[in-house]
Structures are given as C-alpha cells and as structure tokens.
Amino acid sequence: MTPGELRRLYLIIRVFLSYGLDELIPNIRLTLPLRVGRHLFFWLPNRHKDKPLGERLRLALQELGPVWIKFGQMMSTRRDLFPPAIADQLALLQDRVAPFDGALARKHIEIAMGGPLETWFDDFEQEALASASIAQVHTARLKENGQEVVLKVIRPDILPIIKADVRLMYRLAGWVPKLLPDGRRLRPREVVREYEKTLLDELNLLREAANAIQLRRNFEDSPMLYIPEVYSDYCRESVLVMERIYGIPVSDIAALEDQGTNMKLLAERGVQVFFTQVFRDSFFHADMHPGNIFVSYEHPHDPLYIGIDCGIVGSLNKADKRYLAENFIAFFNRDYRRVAELHVDSGWVPCDTNVEDFEFAIRTVCEPIFEKPLAEISFGHVLLNLFNTARRFNMEVQPQLVLLQKTLLYVEGLGRQLYPQLDLWTTAKPFLESWLRDQVGLPAVIRALKEKAPFWAEKFPELPELVYDSLQQHKLLQQSVDKLTTQMQGQQQRQGQSRYLFGVGATLLVSGTILFLANAVEISIGFIVAGVLAWFIGWRRTS
C-alpha cells in the first residue's frame, strides 16, 4: 500500500470503530486476529452505543464521504446481502455534498469548452443551483438565443478520490471470502467492480447526454413524462448543457396539493411511465429517486412528470422482458409452478434445478404476501422475495434486474406517497397483459416478418447455391457415414473372431495343462501349441 492508501485505510478504520461497526465481524476462528486487533485501537471506543447498528452504518458511510455514500446507496438495493433493518437505513443515504467554489467551476468549464465562458453563455451564475458527490449544477443563458440552461460540471478533484477509495474497496473485498463463511457466494469483488463501472459511467457526461436524448425521444409529445432538451453542441465529457426546467419537487406533497394536482392520476402515471420504459422501450431511467423527479406547474388536473439526471439507465433484452412479465402475472395468479419453470427456462437458475423444490420454496416465501389486500402488495418486494429465493438455488446476480428492482421500489414508494390508495397491480396488469398479447399474437408475427424481410431479400438470390451446397455436404456426409459404418462392422467382426479364438486358445491351454499333469506329455504339448497359436491369431486380428 502507498502512504496515501495507508492514511485513508486508517481513517476508514477510525470511523468504523467510532461507530461500533466491529460488531459486523463474525465470531468465528478465522476472524480471531481481527477481534484481537480491535483492542490495539483502544482509544477508538464506540461513541454511538445508543443507536441501532443500521443507523450507525449509515452515519459512518456519510462521514467517509461521497464515494462511500454512493456505495451504500447501491448496496441498499442488494437486500440479499443485508437484513432489512440495515438495507432500509442504507436507502436513507443522501447524496448531498457542499458545493465547490463557483470560480473553480467556471475555470473547469472554460478548460473543457476551450475558451472564455462568455463565448457561449451569458448570465453564468457562480453560486451552484445544486451539488452532489460527482458534479454540481450552475445556471446560465445561451448566447445564441437567450435560452435558459443549466451547466452540470464534474468535480475537478473527484477522479483521484474515486480511484483511491475503489482500490481500497478491492482490497477489503479480497478479505471477505476469508472472513465470512458465506463470503464467496456474495462475490464481493464483482460487487465492487459493478460499483466502479457505475461511478466511471457517471463521470462521463457525454454518456448522460446520450441517455437523456434517448429518453426524450422515447417520450416525445407524451402527456406523462417530459425530459429536458440537451444541447449536444455544448456538451463535453466533463460538462453537460441542458434546458433549465421549472417544477415542483415530487416529494413536496403540500405544494402539489395546494395547486390542485390530481394525485391519483399522478401516482398512476408514475407506474405507467415505469412499465412503458421497461417493456415498450427496453430503456429505463434507473435513478428515479425523488430528487430527480419534478411535476410541471402547468395543467395540475392533467399532471406531467419532469425527469432529470439520466446518468444511470437500465435495459432488458426481449427474453428478460417476456419472462419478467409472465413472472408477475403467474405470481399474482398464485401459479408458483409456472414461476419456478420460468426461472429455469430463462436461465436465471441452473437447468438441473429441482422444479418441485423450487416451487415449494417460492410458495413458502410468497404465499403469506397474499394475506394482504392486493392494493397493499409491493411489486418491489415481490421481486425481492423471488430473487432472494432464487439465489438459494444458485441464481446468478443479474445487474439489469437489480437496477430494475431498485427503480421499481422507488416508483412504488413514490406512488404510494402521492396516493396511499394506489393499487399498483390494477394499474400494471392491463399493461402487462396487453404487452404479452402483442408479443405472441398476429401483430408480433407480422412485425417479425417485416424486421426479417430486408435480410431475406438480400439472401434470396443466394438461396439456390446454398441449397446445392447443403445437398452436396449432405451427400459427402452420408458417404463418410457409410464408410465409417462399414469399418465399424468389420472391426466388430474381427473383435468377435478374436474373442472366439481367445476362448478356444484358453480351453486348449487349460486342457494341455491337465493332460501334462496326467503324464500324457505328447498329447499335452499338441494342445498347448494349438492354444498358443489360437491366442496369437486372435491377437493379430485385434491389431
């Protein structure tokens, strides 16, 4: 380790011990050195004994800074790794960091743009409009048309911090399989690798710009969701320029009610937006926490969502969407056998999984959910229960499904905050059934033919030659098979003759031996010679 890494490691140890997180170390033989080593830091007692473990973990991550805050946020979606009390506390982590100096932001933008800010913008506001761990936002106007915009700029010093902390996380992850009995199954290095990829993706604002453009195109002229326009000509890897929006934060229930917002319709539209993104577009905003969602001031009776911060997105392939939709419908029909079969058919669990055992495990975990009214059943927790059960049957972690589960929990929690009587299943079921019908009905066949038509139009002139080549290959293959069959038959015949000669030879040798013992020497020699000769001929036939 470098001196810098050692200093950072000591800081992490100091923070963890001051919050009493050594309680997380399991009491097993392998961890004895760690538990003994704890006493070497006797000057770092637990200063927060009055708080539960989950809250102490959340506070420790907040104190360690933005990289660890975002890591905790990601871990809050991995409820297979943590008990609910800890996962719930991690979900409360807020990515709020004091802004860095506006003059430094201005300088960094000018470096990225390659010239003075006034070349492209007027009225640049040096005081940040908002700030987070990775970037912060400033307002300005485009010089060319006076359009109000926001400039999102990456923190200049964040990359070295991320790299240093991620290196430490990899080192810590390497200890987990040695310290925890179940550590290997948790695949800690893969968890850190996934987190590192997420962080590095967020550092590239050109990627976020592309995501926002795609989402805006998907919901163009939609009455449900508006995505601000991105000004691509001004975007750089560390600077994003997009339209400034005005709206009510979706978490401000009082303000929404004061302007007469149709809360029931708003909640239902949140669900519809989510399922439209997932099943129609295969491209969904995967960071839909309340800080990234606003509601337009216009038409409160016909409310419109406004989405920002498209740095994290998810996608599902056609097979995943099909199996996910069928899983939901089978679950709410309480067809647990079908749920188990779908997990096997999709490849989410190994093909040799015992379907009966899997069905029973799903039934045991999920049946109690139906003790509640349908309106109170959580889609997110349905997915959580299904995936946690499947992991006991060696289900591989599917990153796209983890993102989907996190987003669904956000959407569901938000919807019920807006309208507590929201029946998510009643809202979603018609959409899912309609989508499934569209995938297997006549429209799906026609659509598939249209998609394949250019390919077959290109290949059609080559078809006679391909058929001829195929017939020739079949003929050659048949000749090879016939030749091989003849060779095998000849070999089997020779082996049969050899076995017969070995048997005759053995009989003659035994008989010759008996005659020799009976003093019939001359006759016995003839039998023995004949036996040896029979063995020799049999051996030659096997060669």
From Swiss-Prot:
Keyword Kinase: yes
Any one GO CC term of the record: plasma membrane
Enzyme Commission identifier(s): 2.7.-.-
Pathway the protein takes part in: Cofactor biosynthesis; ubiquinone biosynthesis [regulation]
Stretches that traverse the bilayer: 514-534
Subcellular localization: Cell inner membrane
The entry's keywords: ATP-binding, Cell inner membrane, Cell membrane, Kinase, Membrane, Nucleotide-binding, Transferase, Transmembrane, Transmembrane helix, Ubiquinone biosynthesis
Residue ranges occupied by any Protein kinase domain in the UniProt entry: 123-501
Membrane topology value: Single-pass membrane protein
List of catalytic residues: D287
BP-aspect Gene Ontology terms: regulation of ubiquinone biosynthetic process; ubiquinone biosynthetic process
Role: Is probably a protein kinase regulator of UbiI activity which is involved in aerobic coenzyme Q (ubiquinone) biosynthesis.
Family of the protein in this entry: Belongs to the ABC1 family. UbiB subfamily.
Protein name in the entry: Probable protein kinase UbiB
Organism: Yersinia enterocolitica serotype O:8 / biotype 1B (strain NCTC 13174 / 8081)
Name of the coding gene: ubiB
